[in-house]
């Protein structure tokens, strides 16, 4: 199991407001994903991976410029997906990177 909070803290330590926004959103997404997957046991979903991936799917927003949600990076917000994927691959998480 990946320590998702530790990984998020590594990249968001200087942005507590953004970290809280990201965590609240990602936790809601993860809760919905897991709830839906549990309603469909016939799919044999890897619930641990699903929850981790949902919690990390927007990790790249820290690199973007979206002041309305406390993002003060330089990239366009639309880039957060591929930037998050690059970050997760760098962290040795290529499977999780595919979800960004």
Per-region residue spans from a language model:
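Short coil-to-beta-strand
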Residues: 1-7, 55, 93
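Active-site flanking loop/helix segments enriched in acidic
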Residues: 2-25, 60-73
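Residues at alpha-helix boundaries and short interhelical turns
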Residues: 16-19, 40-44
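A positional/architectural concept
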Residues: 28-35, 39-40
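Divalent metal-dependent catalytic cores for phosphoryl transfer on phosphate-bearing substrates
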Residues: 42-100
